[in-house]
A protein has these predicted regions:
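Short, compositionally biased P/S/T/A/G/V-rich stretches that sit at domain boundaries
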Residues: 23-47, 132-134
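Glycine-centered loop-to-beta-strand initiation motif
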Residues: 83-94
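Short edge beta-strand/loop segments characteristic of extracellular beta-sandwich folds
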Residues: 48-56
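Enriched for extracellular/lumenal, surface-exposed ectodomains of secreted and cell-surface proteins
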Residues: 100-121
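Short beta-strand elements
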Residues: 114-134
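Short, surface-exposed loop/turn segments at beta-strand-coil junctions that are enriched for proline
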Residues: 56, 93-101
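A short beta-turn/strand-edge loop motif at beta-sheet boundaries
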Residues: 41, 55-62
């Protein structure tokens, strides 16, 4: 009788462990969505790119985002991180008055909520920007 009891308890514990492992491999998928991004600017303009963080087809507040702006030669112009606001929206601003004309690559990456960081997929959106002389 004791052996049957031990087997039953072991089987229940095994089921609990297997159920926990399945959930531990779930990923948190949030992604940045740019809203009507402008791609052409003039030297001296302020680049303003806005959007929202989508999670389960809803805006997600307090999701850490990383914003990178890179010149065509690969040099880094801007590297900033901050969370989406309470409505799940974000805005990136960059002053171009000291920049050279040319192509730039803007990338915004979702780093997920702090509590989901262990299972984050780090989705991003990339946009090519042209900066021209006035």
């Amino acid at each position: 009788m004791t052996a049957k009891k031990n087997y039953l308890i072991s089987f229940v514990i095994l089921l609990i462990i297997c159920g926990s492992i399945k959930n531990s491999f779930a990923t948190h998928i949030s992604q940045p969505v740019l809203i009507d991004p402008k791609t052409h600017f003039t030297v001296g303009d302020t680049v303003v790119l806005s959007g929202w963080v989508e999670y389960n087809a809803q805006p997600a507040p307090d999701v850490l985002l990383n914003f990178k702006l890179i010149r065509s030669d690969g040099s880094l112009v801007a590297n900033q991180s901050y969370p989406s606001n309470q409505k799940g929206h974000f805005e990136f601003k960059f002053d171009t008055k000291n920049e050279l004309p040319g192509s730039y690559q803007f990338t915004v990456t979702s780093h997920c909520l702090e509590i989901h960081r262990y299972a984050c997929t780090y989705k991003n959106q990339t946009l090519s920007i042209q900066l021209s002389n006035p």
